[in-house]
Amino acid sequence: MERTCLAIILAAGESTRMKSAMSKVLHPVAGRAMISHVVDALASASISDVALVVGRDAEAVAAAANTGDVAVTALLQKERLGTAHAVLAAREAIAKGYDDILVVFGDTPLITAAPLEAARDGLAAGNDVVVIGFQAADPTGYGRLIVEGDALVAIREHRDASEEERRITYCNGGLMAIDGRKALDLLDRVGNTNAKGEYYLTDLVEIVRSLGGRAIAVEAPEEELTGCNTRAELAYIERLWQQRRRHELMLAGVSMVAPETVFLSWDTALAQDVLVEPNVVFGPGVRVESGAIIHAFSHLEGAHVRAGAAVGPFARLRTGADLGANSKVGNFCEVKKAEIGAGAKVSHLTYIGDAFVGAGTNIGAGTITCNYDGVNKHVTRIGANAFIGSNSALVAPVSIGDGALIASGSVITEDVPADAVAFGRARQEVKPGRAPILRERYKAEKLARKIAKAAE
């Protein structure tokens, strides 16, 4: 029988060092609240029950944690009296009798399933407490994990550590797994006889040992346990997340010319043999199929780019953009809530919004779908193999049939049938010899202005 597990996410901090109008756990990493990343990791570790300890911005934090993948119950911590006190905000849930209790933090968005599973494996092996630690490049300020043999005997805070203990680089990551059958008894034994009068979860190690139990430590990469308290740390975490995800995608067959300049969102999906040129930003909700090329300086969000399509350079795809196979959206084009058919070309200086563009159609430079009347949005429908001449304005709602041709510079306000040619502009007039007359008139007007100004 599988062991049951309750994960307790501590997210009740005041976030004062973040200097923000909202809780730090709501700040986005890769376009997603950092606490949502933590819940994702729990779901990946097959943990289905979560107790979320909240304080500031309780409703918003609970909403961000409810990703739909796990059952989350929000519990309000009214007083801030230390980590052990925070865990006991979930007393009723702990009392239900889970095999494992896993304590994690809401501000560690880089955590993955692996160390969480390792901690639970430690409990399954008969240990009472498992602490997740890391080897620190610079351990200054961290609590040291004092290990003898394979047992964890103490967690020593930096200020209390001896010179010898300060040389230890194995540090406390804060995350902990506790035997669910003993959790409440152990937590109730934690005292507050310290300078701050708070109840510290780290005391469990020595409490367990004093009762004849056993604690161990399992190691995770340092970056996975990186917490976030300031904007600078938020930027550092973003950088680490981006590096990790870029590396994963390149190993999966995505080419990035200058990966350090490509920015991804938490749900960016790039297929094998996609090529991404430098300085590309992927907002949430982007899917790019095999063989597509995203040229430099393009920005995509909420878009689907199908196989073999080309985007950019300097293109913007907004929510609802759907580019068909082998289609093209070129430089200085914006596409929003529009389908571009297979093989269609929108090559330059164009806005396509609330529209359907048929397969094989060519949209000339400077074309605009005029989709907004100041109150409502309207749809433009362009059939297959049509040709829209440069600098045309298509005033929606309007339909253009298959194979139709729109002359350059046209303003189209009425439907155009299939295979028709439409002109929507004033007829050109040529007046021979008129240019010198106009020039003389303009000169006279200019001289008159100068004389008038001098007389003032």
Swiss-Prot record:
Residues reported in the UniProt entry to bind UDP-N-acetyl-alpha-D-glucosamine: 10-13, 24, 77, 82-83, 143, 157, 172, 229, 318, 336, 351, 362
Residues annotated as binding acetyl-CoA: A365, N371, Y372, S390, S408, R425
Primary location recorded for the protein, binned into one broad class: cytoplasm
GO cellular component: cytoplasm; membrane
Taxonomic source organism: Sinorhizobium medicae (strain WSM419)
Enzyme superclass (EC): transferase
Subcellular location field: Cytoplasm
Classification of source organism: Bacteria, Pseudomonadati, Pseudomonadota, Alphaproteobacteria, Hyphomicrobiales
Cofactor note: Binds 1 Mg(2+) ion per subunit.
Molecular function GO terms recorded: glucosamine-1-phosphate N-acetyltransferase activity; magnesium ion binding; UDP-N-acetylglucosamine diphosphorylase activity
Complex and partners: Homotrimer.
UniProt-annotated stretches for the region Pyrophosphorylase: 1-231
Name of the protein described by the UniProt record: Bifunctional protein GlmU
Keywords per UniProt: Acyltransferase, Cell shape, Cell wall biogenesis/degradation, Cytoplasm, Magnesium, Metal-binding, Multifunctional enzyme, Nucleotidyltransferase, Peptidoglycan synthesis, Repeat, Transferase
PANTHER family given in the database record: BIFUNCTIONAL PROTEIN GLMU, NUCLEOTIDYL TRANSFERASE
